[in-house]
């Protein structure tokens, strides 16, 4: 059996991609014809009975030539085709033998279901060959009536069941020679349980040993006919080829429309786990008011106060206490094909299990944590170090309670851990390089360019620094950072005016974003907040020097505004205050990173693209097939985030400074900062002043800091994506009219703007899809955000944040010098500044929970699909698309070498030097695990 190389773990339906003018295609003609595996026009033909097939080599290509030997046979076939009869009605001389091979992946759930009584019925169906009903669909209509041609149908019978959970079914068809091209296969699951259909391969032979295979990649769940709701079609269709809407063969148009209609749903009712319906809703499921009034949260999206992207509608009933909110009962629905593959799911559950034990078991299983009080600080830095030196033993199975049933399944995967201490935290990579790097100002500054939040730093373009907030509410707009103070810290080498003109001053500006929430956050227990500004100076060797930190508390009815500027100092007291000020800024940056750079810009903002694509782009649409790999697992991980991470009393609220106001802050950031046109990497760099357009420079940009590892490597990836997408778009859209006239494409983009991001629908900056160039740029931006942007801010989280003093998620105490000064707190600070800093850091529980979560989020699964990888190659596309993708893959491999070379270049001090972690987050490929590199196709964790 001839089969294409497929990814066996993907959980998505993806049809074979080919152009409208060429493909491997099964075509059954009624007159003289030629079939070729080259790219002829008209498409490839496989002739009917009475034809003779030969094979030739021509200019390095294999060519199959089929010539009709009998005109009478062709005439007979033509008459049979006109009758529209299926295979059972065909005369033997007027048919072509076609074999279909269906590959089914058996899941662990399926194996468990094999114990059900209904399995016996399924076995009987397998035995008599009535498990899977397949129908071949012609691309043509009946010439006389203009109606659909009758499908050619057959039951598939089980022929193989291997040791790897793959079951093979085969079906034989007698296809009329006048049937025309096979455009699709309709599948009906006659078994009592759902099945995961990996692929279908149709083989047509001439009886002389020559054959042509038409592969159809499915990777989709097919529900059993018995479980389909009344009124819902119980069949699934899988298309054989990509077509733009206007080029869709007449015989497939109604199928195309019906499949889209099914995925849109009717906007009513509660969605079930086996549905494949995509629809929109606001974020009204983050709170849980029915459980506790303190867990109520505002609805995000659909209002001027809290604008937000939309998420997938679940249809769960409204809350009893707040009808605007949705109840949180049961699992969060995502369309069936958006679920994790079982490999991904098992590994995610394994890591989550380890994480739960990391966070909860230490109290009983080690001497690490003697008190699980949420607010207990670490007693010493020595104890922090023991997180990586002493393991936490896995308790006996009998002590695991509800985990008892799943641990035996996972223990096999844990056997490679050293001894019994299988829950040992791995030492983060930056600590392995330099245990004390977190104390150095140089590392603090370097991580703004080569850490996990390289999107925050910006150029200082005016001085004095001024707030845009209302001074009547928040105090004087002008910053307390003076020119004299900065010039002193710059060692008087130049004036502030000169530094600005030479683009030597840079800033982390968390002032206006956080200041309006300072008092709200301070009203909560065991956390605090400031508005902050942090200033850096670009030295002659291309590194940044940390100059000053300004912390601001706005005025309140009971207190005046307080603000103070902190600087590096050799004075002992001031140096400890400096360390505490840096801890506050690091916590601000951690919140900005997790809530905005990571969650909002990659997870949350991408979900509307996925929903709109599935509602408006047919799965046979070339743009759907281009984008689909970049949407893998995103909806599922977002649903998990809503359930566990960003929900009321979830991990984010537990562990980050804004606590219950975390998601509100992300809504404020969406309102003030998010723009689609600024999500492209070049536009983002220019917006922050980190680059300026220069047609003579590489990538058309001149960076403000030459050694900016994220920008330098990221631009290589951006250009590679752009080149690939431009080639793909050019293959299908020759001119502006072809883009503007694509009704599915235009409906997709309209829905992204007016529904998915409906709170910004009238913004003037939305691009128009009116040319191949604008389409390619828009698609490049989507791919960049889903793949490279996410990789840059996700897969280094454990390396940089696993040792939490380097990147505390929360600052829990105010500065000891904040007025009015608490005399007792000041005395404790002076007596034991080390303890004061540890009390400001996350508590033991907060730190270990965050460490465990960052470990999970930073992990690549074994079934990861990487940018430019072989798993998502457009398998059956024409030569132009195949060559473009091969070039894309080759370029990404070249980029890996370029990045390796840069990391060894000692002139690049922001990525090479003693104790410095090399910048590898933009390296495209990776092994499984926590590696600090690798760009998956999608925002998949």
Curated annotation (Swiss-Prot):
Region spans: Disordered: 1-22, 45-68, 255-274, 288-331
Residues annotated as binding Fe cation: 598, 603, 790, 794, 941
Subcellular location: Plastid, Chloroplast
Domain Lipoxygenase: 242-941
Pathway in which this enzyme or protein is active: Lipid metabolism; oxylipin biosynthesis
Disulfide bridge map: none
Keyword Protein biosynthesis: no
Reaction(s) this enzyme catalyzes, per UniProt: (9Z,12Z)-octadecadienoate + O2 = (13S)-hydroperoxy-(9Z,11E)-octadecadienoate; (9Z,12Z,15Z)-octadecatrienoate + O2 = (13S)-hydroperoxy-(9Z,11E,15Z)-octadecatrienoate
EC number: 1.13.11.12
Transit peptide: 1-67
Any one GO molecular-function label of the UniProt entry: oxidoreductase activity, acting on single donors with incorporation of molecular oxygen, incorporation of two atoms of oxygen
Family note: Belongs to the lipoxygenase family.
Protein name: Probable lipoxygenase 8, chloroplastic
Gene: CM-LOX2
């Amino acid at each position: 059996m001839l089969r294409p190389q497929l990814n066996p773990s993907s959980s998505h339906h993806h049809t074979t991609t080919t152009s409208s003018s060429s493909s491997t295609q099964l075509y059954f003609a009624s007159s003289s014809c030629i079939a070729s595996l080259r790219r002829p026009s008209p498409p490839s033909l496989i002739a009917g009975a009475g034809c003779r097939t030969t094979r030739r080599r021509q200019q390095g290509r294999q060519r199959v030539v089929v010539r009709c030997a009998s005109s009478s046979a062709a005439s007979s076939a033509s008459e049979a085709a006109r009758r529209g009869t299926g295979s059972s009605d065909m005369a033997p001389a007027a048919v072509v033998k076609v074999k279909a091979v269906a590959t089914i992946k058996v899941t662990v759930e399926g194996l468990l279901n094999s114990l059900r009584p209904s399995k016996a019925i399924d076995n009987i169906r397998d035995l008599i060959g009535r498990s899977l009903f397949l129908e071949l669909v012609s691309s043509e209509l009946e010439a006389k009536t203009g109606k659909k041609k009758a499908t050619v149908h057959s039951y598939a019978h089980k022929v193989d069941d291997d040791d790897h959970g793959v079951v093979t079914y085969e079906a034989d068809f007698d296809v009329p020679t006048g049937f025309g091209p096979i455009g699709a296969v309709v599948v009906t699951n006659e078994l009592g349980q759902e099945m995961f259909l990996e692929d279908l391969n149709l083989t047509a032979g001439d009886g002389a040993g020559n054959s042509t295979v038409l592969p159809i990649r499915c990777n989709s769940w097919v529900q059993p006919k018995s479980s389909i709701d009344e009124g819902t079609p119980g069949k699934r269709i899988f298309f054989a080829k990509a077509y733009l809407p206007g080029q869709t063969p007449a015989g497939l148009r109604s199928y195309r429309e019906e499949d889209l209609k099914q995925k849109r749903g009717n906007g009513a009712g509660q969605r079930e786990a086996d549905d494949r319906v995509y629809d929109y809703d606001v974020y009204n499921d983050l709170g849980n008011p029915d459980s506790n009034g303190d867990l109520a949260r505002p609805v995000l999206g659909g209002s001027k106060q809290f604008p937000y992207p939309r998420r997938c509608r679940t249809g769960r009933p409204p809350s009893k206490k707040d009808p605007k909110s949705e109840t949180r009962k049961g699992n969060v629905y995502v369309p069936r094909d958006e679920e994790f593959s079982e490999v991904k799911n098992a590994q995610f559950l394994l890591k989550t299990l380890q994480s739960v034990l990391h966070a909860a078991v230490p109290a009983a299983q080690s001497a690490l944590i003697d008190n699980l009080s949420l607010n207990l600080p670490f007693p010493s830095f020595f104890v922090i170090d023991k997180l990586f030196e002493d393991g936490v033993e896995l308790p006996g199975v009998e002590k695991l309670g509800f985990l008892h049933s799943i641990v035996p399944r996972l223990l096999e995967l844990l056997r490679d851990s050293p001894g019994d201490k299988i829950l040992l935290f791995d030492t983060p990579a930056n600590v392995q390089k330099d245990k004390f790097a977190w104390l150095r100002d140089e590392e603090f500054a370097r991580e703004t360019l080569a850490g996990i939040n390289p999107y925050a730093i910006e150029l200082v373009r005016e001085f004095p620094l001024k707030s845009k907030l209302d001074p009547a509410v928040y105090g004087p707009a002008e910053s307390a950072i003076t020119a004299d103070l900065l010039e002193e810290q710059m060692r008087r080498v130049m004036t502030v005016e000169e530094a600005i003109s030479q683009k030597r001053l840079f800033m982390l500006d968390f002032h206006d974003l956080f200041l309006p929430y300072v008092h709200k956050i301070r009203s909560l227990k065991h956390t605090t907040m400031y508005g902050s500004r942090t200033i850096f100076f670009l030295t002659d060797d291309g590194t940044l020097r940390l100059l000053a930190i300004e912390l601001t508390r706005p005025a309140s009815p009971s207190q005046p505004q307080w603000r103070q500027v902190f600087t590096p100092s050799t004075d002992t007291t001031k140096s400890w205050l400096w360390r505490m000020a840096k801890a506050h800024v690091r916590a601000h940056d951690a919140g900005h990173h997790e809530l905005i750079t990571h969650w909002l810009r990659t997870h949350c903002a991408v979900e509307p693209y996925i929903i709109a694509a599935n509602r408006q782009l047919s799965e046979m649409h070339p743009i759907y097939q281009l984008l689909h790999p970049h949407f893998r697992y995103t909806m599922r991980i977002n649903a998990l985030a809503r359930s566990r991470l960003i929900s009321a009393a979830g991990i984010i609220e537990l562990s980050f400074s804004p606590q219950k106001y975390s998601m509100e802050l992300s809504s404020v950031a969406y309102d003030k900062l998010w723009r689609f046109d600024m999500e492209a990497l070049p536009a983002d760099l220019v917006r922050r002043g980190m680059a300026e357009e220069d047609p003579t420079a590489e990538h058309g940009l001149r960076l403000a800091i030459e050694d900016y590892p994220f920008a330098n490597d990221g631009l290589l990836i951006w250009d590679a994506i752009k080149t690939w997408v431009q080639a793909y778009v050019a293959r299908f859209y020759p001119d502006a009219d072809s883009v503007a006239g694509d009704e599915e494409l235009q409906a997709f983009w309209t829905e992204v703007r007016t529904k998915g991001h409906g709170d910004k629908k009238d913004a003037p900056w939305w691009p128009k899809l009116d040319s191949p160039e604008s389409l390619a740029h828009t698609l490049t931006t989507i791919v960049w955000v889903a793949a490279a942007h996410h990789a840059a801010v996700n897969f280094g989280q454990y390396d940089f944040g696993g040792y939490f003093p380097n990147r505390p998620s929360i600052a829990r105490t105010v500065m000891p010098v904040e007025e009015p000064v608490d005399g007792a707190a000041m005395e404790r600070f002076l007596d034991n500044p080390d303890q004061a800093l540890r009390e400001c850091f996350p508590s033991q529980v907060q730190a270990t929970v965050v460490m465990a979560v960052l470990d999970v989020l930073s992990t690549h699964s074994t079934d990861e699909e990487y940018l430019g990888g072989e798993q998502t190659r457009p398998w059956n596309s024409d030569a132009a698309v195949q060559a473009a993708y091969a070039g894309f893959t080759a370029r990404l491999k070249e980029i890996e070498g370029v990045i390796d070379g840069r990391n060894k270049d000692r002139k690049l001090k922001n990525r090479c030097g003693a104790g410095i972690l090399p910048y590898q987050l933009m390296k495209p490929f990776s092994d499984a695990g926590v590696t600090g590199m690798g760009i998956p196709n999608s925002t998949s964790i």
